[in-house]
Amino acid sequence: MKIRIAARGSKLSRIQVDMLGEKLKKIGIEYEIIDIKTKADLFSTEPLSKLGKGVFEKEVNEAVLEGKADIAVHSMKDILSEINPSLEIFAVLKRDPPYDILIAEKNLDKLDSNITIGTSSIRRKNFLKYIKPEINTKDIRGNVDTRIRKYLSKEYQGLILAEASLKRLNMTMNYHRLNVYDFTPEANQGIIVALGRKKDEKIKEIFKEINHKDTLDEALAERAVISLVGGGCHSPIGVLFKKEGKEFYGIASYSDGKKKITVSISKPGDPYTIGSELGLLLKKEMKNEDIIP
């Protein structure tokens, strides 16, 4: 059997598909890649905030819905908006490091004033503005290679990226991992997900064999927070869960650049209940501080 996998045509996306494909090969399943151009690819110089929701996912998911592919593979942080009701999560791979990193000559505490840090994430911008208001941020688009090239050419004095991206690309840049209390990661950062059609029971059963349950539980808890509070790649909300045994450890943060709220939770339970509880805590604190998301 050969499974058709739809994904963006970028280098990082291809690596992510191959990571999942290797898991399939180990259980005797072959795969082929269907390259898809997304809105984010077609408008690669536009700020993400101007492109709306689903810019990394819509066209890829449509290929599955239209029967051109069997599975859509994404960085799970890119699909925080509601998934099409005809699709569902078939599997996730074991999570890579979920952290944000700073690529710069100095660590965050020692950065000079009035330098420019490249990031297109409103979450990262606001967290940085809260911690270091004297530092400037500037939108940066393009793949990781392009961003690093701009940094090395001194167009930016630093970059904030996802650590998982560098790991998957096998890049050896020196970087500083950012504290999760200062830079709580985007929900589902570091997770690769496979979506399929709900009706495809045969393929669904295959993907159960490669699913990493603890990672999926962490992802679902984080998504419950985002669903309750409202968020995604255009929102300044960070949330991270770690599951150890039956225990969930979670942290969620929100910042408008002037104020910052962080809440946490530690208890056993199911992902949806724990995530919803953390989301309610965050909403309550946001209301107390007169912050409207």
From Swiss-Prot:
Protein family according to the UniProt entry: Belongs to the HMBS family.
Enzyme class, UniProt record, top EC level: transferase
One BP term from GO: protoporphyrinogen IX biosynthetic process
Alphabetized Pfam families for the sequence: Porphobil_deam (PF01379), Porphobil_deamC (PF03900)
Source lineage: Archaea, Thermoproteota, Thermoprotei, Sulfolobales, Sulfolobaceae
A GO cellular-component term linked to this record: cytoplasm
Function: Tetrapolymerization of the monopyrrole PBG into the hydroxymethylbilane pre-uroporphyrinogen in several discrete steps.
Residues carrying S-(dipyrrolylmethanemethyl)cysteine: C233
InterPro entries, per the entry: HemC, Porphobilin_deaminase_cofac_BS, Porphobilin_deaminase_N, Porphobilinogen_deaminase_C, Porphobilinogen_deaminase_C_sf
Required cofactor(s): dipyrromethane
Note accompanying the cofactor annotation: Binds 1 dipyrromethane group covalently.
Enzyme Commission identifier(s): 2.5.1.61
GO MF annotation: an example: hydroxymethylbilane synthase activity
NCBIfam families named among the record's database cross-references: hemC (TIGR00212)
Catalytic activity: 4 porphobilinogen + H2O = hydroxymethylbilane + 4 NH4(+)
Note: The porphobilinogen subunits are added to the dipyrromethane group.
Stated name of the protein: Probable porphobilinogen deaminase
UniProtKB keywords: Porphyrin biosynthesis, Transferase
Pathway the protein contributes to: Porphyrin-containing compound metabolism; protoporphyrin-IX biosynthesis; coproporphyrinogen-III from 5-aminolevulinate: step 2/4
